[in-house]
Amino acid sequence: PGAVSPMIAAGRVVKELYPDAMTVFVGPCMAKKKEAREEDIADAVDYVLTFQEVQDIFDAAGIQPELLSEDEKEHSSRAGRIYARTGGVSEAVKKTVEQIDPDKKIPVIPEQADGVPACKKLIERIQKGETEANFFEGMACNGGCVGGPKIIIKKEEGKERVDAYGDEAQYRTPLENPF
């Protein structure tokens, strides 16, 4: 089987650890709603909500998240926290592989594409052998998930927040995480 998205992988882990759990993915991506219903992976995520839908629910219920106390997720690594922006997946994979095998004979050489037109061009370059990269990251939305269609803050602010959140992580990669 091929690789699955972080949404599906996380959903499957939760279902494995807590078989009766109901899983809900929240993000800026409309495509995740369709992905979660794909027959071969529909077991992982029960519901998908966009940031805008969650904001609408909060508004209707009178919930003001900024007034709630924070719940620190000290167990997540920087590598996991920066996936949401272009270059985040590449950086996470490169750093983790380097940590697994620092003397690796074939280094990870990433290349990113930001937005659908750039993804198409990257695919064409790969097919023509016009790149030295051996790991490819394609983000359909400009800026990555932080630029998705249902964002509720500007993508530039989203990228800054993702990077800051990554910088706060206790662990650089999942390998350092004892949990």
Positions of predicted regions on the chain:
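Iron-sulfur-associated redox domains of electron-transfer enzymes in respiratory
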Residues: P1-F179
